[in-house]
């Protein structure tokens, strides 16, 4: 589960960078 946390944060970072 802890491995999903950095993945989610990275996804949010990529999503924010996209906009």
Curated annotation (Swiss-Prot):
Q: Which GO terms describe its cellular component?
A: extracellular region
In the record, which positions carry Phenylalanine amide? Answer: 19
One Gene Ontology term from the biological process aspect of the record: defense response
Tissue-wise expression: Expressed by the skin glands.
Q: Keywords, A to Z?
A: Amidation, Amphibian defense peptide, Antimicrobial, Secreted
Q: What is its main location?
A: secreted
Q: Does the keyword Ion transport apply?
A: no
Q: Where in the cell is it found?
A: Secreted
Report the sequence similarity comment from the record: Belongs to the frog skin active peptide (FSAP) family. Phylloseptin subfamily.
Instruction: Tell me, in a sentence or two, what this protein's role is.
Output: Has antimicrobial activity.
The molecule here is called Phylloseptin-Az5
Q: Which organism is it from?
A: Pithecopus azureus
**Gene that encodes it:** psn13
